[in-house]
Amino acid sequence: MALTIGIVGLPNVGKSTLFNALTGNTVLAANYPFATIDPNVGVVNLPDVRLNRLAEIFGSERILPATVSFVDIAGIVKGASEGEGLGNKFLANIREAHAIAQVVRAFDDPDVIHVDGKVDPASDMETINTELILADLQTLENAIPRLEKAVKIKKGDAAQLETYKAAQKILEDGDTIISRAKDEKLELAHLKELNLLTAKPFIYVFNADEGILASEEKQQELRDMVAPAEAVFLDAKLEADLVELSEEEAREMLEMNGQDESGLDQLARVGFSTLGLQTYLTAGPKEARAWTIYKGDTAPQAAGVIHSDFERGFIKAEVVSFKDLDEAGSMAEAKARGKVRMEGKDYIMQDGDVCDFKIGG
């Protein structure tokens, strides 16, 4: 599976600059609203040093890391649901994303205009969330009557209709669905086919200046503002510069800015964590590769990510943890140390498992 994250935010908050840094693209990043009109899609490799080590051990010809797809859409303004700015039709471009990354301006720069005339992260987040809520309300207002008719003639799911109405009530209260789903015991699976934006996990990406990046206290204030959602802090312009540098130069620049991890790596890591994802590894002479699965997936489900036939034909899996294989230096030595196991259909995969699946016809 490929993880897809939709990037939203007001105009001029640094969305396109961040997207350029993420993807190495050069989409228009301008100092005026609506520089991005058509959605930009980019696929980003997830950094994983384990793959380099696996390629060394197995003599792999190539390395294939797990990937994240990012979709950058036009800036949203207050009143978009009623046609302000470019309206909200382009939100359809991110409805199938697994998560929403909301980019929030947290930097002062008189040369970069703010669409509302002032830098106010709380107000900006409220504007975006309100527009996403209104977009979801429009979707539910169309879906509920159709499902009510289906339920009346015994062709619809009454429990699903209840969930639709409960979600509508949450939105009418001015809240995102994801923020209250747990407390309301909402069955999110009933909403899946609607691809509601506010039912997706949120990540808040604060495009910040040095005053915030160097202050744990200020970062904590913003974290508290968005909790229980995850927050990422970065300087989009710095991130764009980092991707132009060598690995060593980038590390030095990060250290100069008091950071031990780039914002892009942080965003990818948080995206995985937010969605409950992990990776397992495969390796051989041709390639060393990372595969994305959900935490809690079984060995057959993991095999199915490679090919659906592998899940159906799963017999067993030869498994060794990356840590044990790294220490052993070869599969032969890992086996000699008793670190390689044969696992069956009920085995729950662990992050960093190195696997060789045995598949029947």
Tell what function each PLM region has.
Residues 36, 86-87, 117-120, 220-223:
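Glycine-rich, phosphate-binding/catalytic loops in enzymes
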Residues 24, 56, 92, 96, ...:
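Short, intrinsically disordered, mixed-charge
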Residues 2-8, 13, 19, 146-348, ...:
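C-terminal-of-GTPase-core extension/linker across diverse P-loop GTPases
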Residues 96, 350-351:
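Short, flexible surface segments
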Residues 1-111, 141-143:
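Conserved G1/Walker A P-loop phosphate-binding module
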Residues 42-47, 74-84, 95-157, 170-184, ...:
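Conserved Switch II/interswitch segment of TRAFAC-class P-loop GTPases
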Residues 22-32, 39-41, 49, 53, ...:
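Residue-level signal for pocket-adjacent positions within structured domains
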Residues 34, 48-51, 64-70, 84-98, ...:
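Amphipathic alpha-helical transducer elements in NTP-driven molecular machines
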